A protein has these predicted regions:
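Short, Lys/Arg-rich, polar N-terminal cytosolic tail immediately upstream
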Residues: 1-4
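A structural signal for multi-pass alpha-helical bundles of membrane permease subunits
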Residues: 6-278
Length: 278
């Protein structure tokens, strides 16, 4: 019996951690359907009924910011994966001068704190106003693509190193171009780790507040900026806006929840296979 106590203790700790993780979601869900009176009376009580007006009001406020966030995330992640796959392929399967030195330089970028680049990045985007990207999606997408390269190249290059070079050489002998080898052989074999890299980049871009607040005009503001603005209104107007705020938080979580639901299998495969390669 005494041997089972450590096992029971582990289960107890896991249950406590699970409850701590679930409680914020539970708090959001129950308060997103409450009326103003119910929320001000007891925020922890269950709602007596379901009030969908909070969701309709919240969506009227954040519909455009959600669209902006989706456009920025999709374009940024597509750019990150496209350039990172090409770079990782070149570092793995192609011979060119200073290949190792360049890869070490790319890896060294991971050691630079992102906050140190904020002022130079801001000034650089402002100087690109002639290209029409200052204040709109392009002014944010380009920094995201550039900032996601170092980590993505490192992970993809590590995985690509486990692919048999004999397979690549055989394709070259058969007359396949480098583009054909990358698109028809390397990318399909690396799909799980590519999905993992995509998810790892999607989450911080979707949740980012600092860069959008610095670089975007009001018309192109993202979901995080809208949520912070709505939170300020809720605090100013007491409890009248908190139900709408909770509903907006729930809506903001839905895209990532759907993403993880459909991509979880590939995400886990990519993490485990990448760990084995490393």
């Amino acid at each position: 019996m005494s041997r089972k106590w450590p096992e029971y203790l582990r289960y107890l700790i896991l249950v406590i951690l699970a409850l701590c993780a679930i409680f914020p979601i539970f708090f959001l869900l129950i308060n997103s359907t409450k009326t103003q009176l119910e929320f001000s009376t007891n925020p922890l009580s269950l709602p007596t009924g379901i009030d969908w007006h909070n969701y309709t009001n919240a969506f009227d406020i954040i519909d455009r910011p959600i669209l902006n966030s989706v456009i920025i995330v999709v374009a940024s992640v597509f750019g990150i994966l496209a350039f990172a796959c090409m770079s990782a392929y070149a570092f793995t399967f192609m011979n060119f001068p200073f290949r190792r030195v360049l890869f070490v330089a790319v890896f060294a970028l991971l050691l630079i704190p992102g906050v140190l680049t904020l002022i130079p990045l801001y000034l650089q985007i402002k100087r690109l106003d002639a290209f029409g990207i200052n204040g709109n999606w392009g002014g944010l997408i380009l920094p995201y693509i550039a900032g996601g390269q170092a980590f993505s190249i490192f992970v993809l290059r590590t995985f690509f190193g486990g692919i048999s070079k004999d397979l690549v050489d055989a394709a070259r002998v058969d007359g396949a171009s480098e583009w054909h080898i990358l698109g028809k052989i390397v990318v399909p074999l690396s799909l799980p780790v590519i999905v993992s890299v995509a998810v790892i980049n999607i989450v911080p871009i979707w949740n980012d507040y600092l860069l959008p607040s610095l670089l975007l005009a009001e018309k192109y503001k993202t979901l995080t900026i809208a949520l912070v603005s709505l939170q300020g209104n809720a605090q100013t107007h007491s409890s009248s806006q908190f139900g709408i705020l909770m509903a907006a938080y729930v809506v903001a979580c839905i895209p990532l929840a759907i993403l993880f639901t459909f991509l979880m299998r590939y995400y886990v495969q990519g993490l485990t296979s990448g760990a084995l390669k490393i």
